[in-house]
């Protein structure tokens, strides 16, 4: 999984050299941010169920057809609602992985790389997940550096889906 730290180490190693002072400064900066990222990941994890439920409701409110259309890819019945919540939870979980890793690697490798194919195959609209992530961003209750860290990865996911 790529992070700024693993990329710096990989580059230095492939060139047979020690980390440069710039690379070391990046590493120290990441260590300072790590605590905020871990706090954000813990808070999002602790509040995951309520955030996912609220995000799903935000999707249903903005896109009412998702609960009115019958079919495997809609939320007209409990099974569909459970699948929607599961998918939103997956996005949130990947964001927490980014917070722990300190980079977008988890989003890039586990989500964004195959999202177009997944959405096409299952007839899913990225706009549903954009709305869900916007809800999570607006309602996670984080502040300060933890908020900034979480929002940076939520924004990254939102932009990738937009």
Curated annotation (Swiss-Prot):
After translation, how is this protein modified?
Contains one covalently linked phycocyanobilin chromophore.
One GO CC term of this entry? plasma membrane-derived thylakoid membrane
**Subcellular location as annotated:** Cellular thylakoid membrane
Question: Which UniProt key words apply to this protein?
Answer: Antenna complex, Bile pigment, Chromophore, Electron transport, Membrane, Photosynthesis, Phycobilisome, Thylakoid, Transport
| Free-text function comment from the UniProt entry | Light-harvesting photosynthetic bile pigment-protein from the phycobiliprotein complex (phycobilisome, PBS). Phycocyanin is the major phycobiliprotein in the PBS rod.
Q: Which family does it belong to?
A: Belongs to the phycobiliprotein family.
User: What's the protein called, per UniProt?
Assistant: C-phycocyanin alpha subunit
Give the species. Answer: Synechocystis sp. (strain ATCC 27184 / PCC 6803 / Kazusa)
